[in-house]
């Protein structure tokens, strides 16, 4: 059985490989979007304030209040709290990485060189 940390790491890897949410892409989200999205997935369903609207289409779209992106990116997993918490954890990990990379760049540290050095080990 996998640990929570392993499940979160696997979800983060899936986000990068299948969704294309790379560190370079994440660097564009400078307004806490990933942390906000993580908090939405971390809340149990009964605590989410769902906004319902028609968004110009006859089909109703639902997503949590404060959701930082287009409604199409809200992908809850009803009945699977582990999967939702894995998404939340992976988004938090991505936000931590983004903040650390931004801090290193602000101090003149080349994050690409660090990544290259790690890959060659």
Residues covered by each model-derived region:
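Intrinsically disordered, low-complexity regulatory regions
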Residues: 1-121
